[in-house]
Each structure stands twice: as C-alpha cells, then as structure tokens.
C-alpha cells in the first residue's frame, strides 16, 4: 500500500481554477464514495476549502493511482486533463505525510500557523469515516496529524501572535490590564479594519461598544447586544467625549480627532493612513507606525516558530514509518493469540468432560480466568515483538518467533503490501 497526495492549492493554482475545483459539502460524500470505486484507490479523504482541494489516498500502485485520481478530478470538475496537469501536485510516501502534517498546523496556509484549517481537516476526516472510505493507513495518518497539530498549537502558541493591525491593537490594549467592565470604547469607521476591531472587541466584556460610521446602516448591522450602539457622523464629538478607548479606522484628509474632544485619560489607536488623530504629546496615542513595528515582529516570530515545527515534523515521519513497519507484525501477533485461545478452548472442553457438574456461572468464571492468564503471559512477548518489528534484524527475529510458536509463515503474508 502506498500513501499518495494529489492536490491543488493557492500556492500553485490560479483562482479561476480553484473556484471550479471545489467540492461543496453536499458533493463531498458522493465524491468520496465514487473516488473509492476508482481502480487502485483503496482509501481516500477529500479536503476542499477556499484555498485548496486535496485528495489523500492509499493506493496499491502509485502510477495507476496518480492516473485515475487525476482523471477523477478532471471529470468531476469538467476541466481538461491537460489544463489540470499544469497545477496538480503529487506527493508520495513520506512527502505526502509531510504535507498533511504541514497543512494540519497551518504551515501551508496563506496566514502561517492559522488554526482554522485544523477544524476543516478534522471535519474532512470525520466525513470520510462516515462514508466508509478510510482504512487503517489514513486513519492512523490523520489521527497522528490532528494530535500533532494540537500539540504544536499548545506548545508554541503561534496564533497568539496576530497578523492584522486590528487584532494587534486589541492585544496591545489587553496588555494594559484594564478593567473592561468599566470601559466604554468607540470604533470610528467600519471598513475592513474597523469591522475586525469590532469583532474582537465584542469578545471582551466592555461596558459599551459605540460604533460610528458615515453610513449608519453599516453600524446597525452589529447591534446584536444591548451594550452595542450605532451612531452617524454627526455624533462624532458626543461619542468621543464618552469613550475611554477610541479605535479610529477611518481614512481622512485632515485630522478629525483632537485632544480637546476626548475624555481625560482616553486611549486612542489610530489605525489608518493618512492619520485621523492629532499627534498631541498629551494623548496616550498608538498609531499605525507603532503597531506595524509590533506586527512585523509577530510575523518574524511566526516564521521562526514555523521553522521549529518543521523540524518536529521529521520526528512524526519516523513515528509513522515505525507504525507502518509494525503492521507486518500484527498478523503474527493475532496468530499467536488465536493459537493460545485455541489451547484455552480445548482445555475448557476437557475440563467440562472431566467435571460435568460445573454450573454455567462456574464455567464462565474459569474461562475468564484462563483468558486472563493468557493475556498476562502474552503481554510482554507482544510488546517485545512490536519492538523487534522495527529493529535492524526484524525479518530474522520475527521469523524466529514464528518458528518458536510453530507458525511457519513468511513475513509480509497478509500484510496487504
């Protein structure tokens, strides 16, 4: 069995192709089942988001798997194979798994380290399991990837380093340790930055959130809580006078915010260029230059963390390789267990003949304890077998164990390779 990745991503593929090559939620289940019917494809999981459409496959032959998966995508999306081939990326074996691990932690995302893709990957895995298109290999690969990604997020906290001016400003405010329950904030301007600030502000327990925009209806769209209010441009002075914290996300040709308009001790974040707030020395003012410097530092930290995570991915590849190698020992372990259970069943039959008056409860208790003895006796040998299966002389060691147990078999039998 071979691990194969077939994908289109934002890195290599133009938006015009990505828009066509996208599985909707409704199509996903049908596509999984149809893909599994294709020649050579034994297992499959489909990940389809706005930035990528990826097939994670287990195939019995790489060449055949590549051919049929490629044609499946071309037929499904009605894109000529020749055109699709310009952008399709194929990865095999370790490189397929490496890509999966990188995707899981966000190293292949537009925003390095973002965690949204982890939820999308988990959902893709669950959908494939429901469709019955996964098996032992993809189950292990995806469980390992999801566990790895969670551990990396917990260890490195890469998402604690924002990549937007809006979130950087909010986190700068967080560091001041203010009692938000007594603070009123104002967001001036509801363009992209202003909306982002509003989103993060509403996640915090501010006493009130005042939204001011030239088009009041845009502010009214955020009136989801009693503490949120919408204001027009003519209310600027009134809003500023009442705010403890001001986020100005509006582009103006001249200053519209002056110290005299603000409450004493007010904090101002001027988030756009040209600046909208007069740079008075009497103000506690954070401007785009201050925050951009902080943002660049965060971006550099994300890249540095990405490099450290990439090194840990190499360790995950070794773990998966060890697991794959141990697959060969599973049939032998099962045969040893089966042989022991056959002996137990034979002993039980003999016991019942010699002591026919045993009650059903007594028979069950004796059988239970006999199986317990078998499990205790086999526990350590099985652990040692798993260790031997990844050793330098694994073929010889396992053949010897099989011979000792009277199981004359060759390694590789029933492995599915």
Curated annotation (Swiss-Prot):
Record key words, sorted: NADP, Oxidoreductase, Porphyrin biosynthesis
Pfam families: GlutR_dimer, GlutR_N, Shikimate_DH
UniProt-listed GO biological process terms: protoporphyrinogen IX biosynthetic process from glutamate
Catalytic activity: (S)-4-amino-5-oxopentanoate + tRNA(Glu) + NADP(+) = L-glutamyl-tRNA(Glu) + NADPH + H(+)
Entry function: Catalyzes the NADPH-dependent reduction of glutamyl-tRNA(Glu) to glutamate 1-semialdehyde (GSA).
Subunit comment: Homodimer.
Misc: During catalysis, the active site Cys acts as a nucleophile attacking the alpha-carbonyl group of tRNA-bound glutamate with the formation of a thioester intermediate between enzyme and glutamate, and the concomitant release of tRNA(Glu). The thioester intermediate is finally reduced by direct hydride transfer from NADPH, to form the product GSA.
Name this polypeptide is given: Glutamyl-tRNA reductase
